Amino acid sequence: MERRLILWLDEISKDLLPLVGGKAAGLGEMIKAGIPVPPGFVVTSEAYRRFVFETGIAGFIKHILEETIVSGRPEEYEKASELIRSKFVRTPMPPYLRRAIVDAYRKLGTLVGVEEPRVAVRSSATVEDLPEASFAGQQETYLNVKGEEEVVEKVKTAWASLWTARALSYRDSLNIDHETALMAVVVQKMVSSRSSGVMFTIHPVTGEEDKIVIESIWGLGEYIVGGKVTPDRFVVSKSDLEILEVRISRKDKALFYDPDLNENVEIKIPESGEELEDLRRKHPAVAEVVEKYGIRPDAPSLSEKEVKELARLAIKVENHFARPMDIEWAIDFELSPPENILLLQARPETVWSRKKEEAEAKPPEEEAVPEGEVLVRGVPASPGVASGRVKVALTVEEAAKKMEKGDVLVTKMTDPDWVPYMKMASAIVTDEGGMTAHAAIVARELGIPAVVGTGDATKKLKDGMLVTVDGSRGVVYAGAVKTEEAREEEARPELGAAVAEVLSEVYPVTATKIYMNLGHPEEIDRYKHLPFEGIGLMRIEFIISSWIGYHPMYLIEQGRGVYFIDKLAEGVAKVASAIYPRPVVVRFSDFKTNEYRRLKGGEKYETLDERNPMIGWRGVSRYIHPNYEPAFRLEVRAIKKVREEWGLKNVWVMFPFVRTTWELERALKIMEEEGLSRGRDFKVWIMVEVPSTVFLADEFAKMVDGFSIGSNDLTQLVLGVDRDSGFLAKMGYFDERDPAVLRSIEILIEKAHSQGATVSICGQGPSVYPELVEFLVRRGIDSISVNPDAVVRVRRQVASIERRIMLERLEELGSRLSRL
């Protein structure tokens, strides 16, 4: 079988990948999983190999590459590509290869009941869709191809597309040997697309695994991959297929097949009856489709039912391949629902699968939190921050003349031909496109910050302007918002990248999330490459005592409340930007009365003489009291500033020392009055330190998204032991492993999970007691947050425990089956 020239999609599996390429292997696997795919066949890589070796093209390619590509400049790639591709075009197809392709095309016509069916001819390179390398459109696709001779020529042209300048440059950037690159070609029945698009089973920008992102446009899908139209975007929850986010873009043009002209035509989507009549005069068949389906520039290109059906298919694809996937799809107006939804391609999502986002992103330092003038806003497409001089280029030729290393490339859109110039850029800004456009995908892979879909960047930004592009927030600022220290660190990206890459391979993935505790914002630079999923506890007390130094009520009295807000926001943003998009759970202040008194100006406001501040006026009881509520509002405003003004939506909050539901309800109301409310991207947690939160966990769970166990305080209050008493500790009373404490944790997890809330732990216990970690994992805790020095050790321990649990369950299952 390995030497066959033609294979049909329904006889292909991933085992034949070297013969059929990634695209075809993915299609074959989807067919096996019962997923709707247009019928077709594959001209295998064996046919390509015979063509290039029997005609002498292979030797010609080797000679051209050695002689032409010397320094890696874009012009060298262009010259080599032109020579090689013209050689393909001039070389006739050997008769036996032509016969094999024609016979398969005729058979496809018989299968679909059309003598000369319209087909899509798509490249399927043998390394194109592997997890290690996403070529995202590096080779060509030809749509609505009809007739035997045309199909044969397009197969040959698809083979030649293995040698475009962009493909050559891309393989070099990933150190892929050109001699190992082979090309298969997929020939499929053409879909008559009413709508088409791309979807990811992981959020392509934030890496959230519980979301599906669907982008769609009218007509054929080439305009979404090429970024020629800014697509509609739908974000769907995997758990219940609820549509979480909808963004309808203006889609003023589309590509449709015109049967009267037998070619694809670009149309202006009509907004009025007059424009529809004009379209009917030029392209009557296309106008009929536009009118029948209510196609308008501002109308949604998908119905709610279609969004959910696409999401359902996406989950089915991900489950079959057992990894996040990047999927192309189309809706055929010639078919009836639900058979009209067809999947055209599925390949492994590459960026988050390699876990290189943290290493490749360039997060701002403390001083680099953007405060400059906002010039342009768009869709955040590739995370990171970079500064440079603007070069506006509307064509590849213009980019070739203007671009220098480190420039900010500004253009209407970037298709695959732009890759050599994207590699030269420090950042990319486009007028059009969405987060799944080709430009966004490649920018993420290359680690280049990108903002797409701005609408007018090419008009607002001028050549030579110094700007800062924040790809995480979708904003372009005036000037270079960076420090020299940040520049020096970015000049040595290989250090952080190397550490992150090593860690991603050495330390295992766990079902139980491993978070890290952090108190000093400056420490994040030392620890950001550790293998943790987020900050499970960010204490702000250090920021207040060291960065601010004053009692917040004193600052309010002096009219300097904004100073408190800004400094607290800076400290939080430093951490959140450094690990974006991983979450940062910020705990509101939890000073005791005596600690607040030590702040400058504190004596005036902390007059309460408490014998035991540990269980006194602290936590939420302080936030809702008139004597401190104005200060709490400053904390809330700082969080709002970080999330809304600076776009760091990965910042969540946590209330400490919660005693009752009514006090939490009042604190949440204050937060809402300041413009912060729980939502899909804003989680609210509470600390579990007081036994009342354990017993009433099911009630608290209706008000919050998660719980975090403060095991030190919880142990103190469950056992009635002063945590600071060395005398009682020596007697063995203070022990987080005490059965009463463990039972409290068990009750909490059961009650929280029954209401859909998550449970974490941020106390010292897991860092000290391995047996406590095992207890927590076996009880189903969602995450464990530990100090930086324990992250690696606890992650390994959790992975080991989870493996043991899996083996135990398999043994139990085997035992049950043996008794049947």
Curated annotation (Swiss-Prot):
Identify the cofactor(s): Mg(2+)
Q: Which Pfam families match?
A: PEP-utilizers (PF00391), PEP-utilizers_C (PF02896), PPDK_N (PF01326)
Single GO MF descriptor = pyruvate, water dikinase activity
Please tell me where substrate binds in this chain: 539, 587, 689, 710-713
Copy the pathway line from the protein's UniProt record: Carbohydrate biosynthesis; gluconeogenesis
Q: Which reaction does it catalyse?
A: pyruvate + ATP + H2O = phosphoenolpyruvate + AMP + phosphate + 2 H(+)
Q: Record's InterPro entries?
A: ATP_grasp_subdomain_1, PEP-util_enz_mobile_dom, PEP_synth, PEP_util_AS, PEP_util_C, PEP_util_CS, Phosphohistidine_dom_sf, PPDK_AMP/ATP-bd
Question: What's the Enzyme Commission number for this chain?
Answer: 2.7.9.2
Keyword tags: ATP-binding, Kinase, Magnesium, Metal-binding, Nucleotide-binding, Transferase
GO BP term, example: gluconeogenesis
The miscellaneous comment for this protein is: The reaction takes place in three steps, mediated by a phosphocarrier histidine residue located on the surface of the central domain. The two first partial reactions are catalyzed at an active site located on the N-terminal domain, and the third partial reaction is catalyzed at an active site located on the C-terminal domain. For catalytic turnover, the central domain swivels from the concave surface of the N-terminal domain to that of the C-terminal domain.
Role, per record: Catalyzes the phosphorylation of pyruvate to phosphoenolpyruvate.
Write out the similarity annotation.
Answer: Belongs to the PEP-utilizing enzyme family.
* Name under which the protein is recorded: Phosphoenolpyruvate synthase
Q: What organism is this sequence from?
A: Aeropyrum pernix (strain ATCC 700893 / DSM 11879 / JCM 9820 / NBRC 100138 / K1)
Which gene name does the record give?
Answer: ppsA
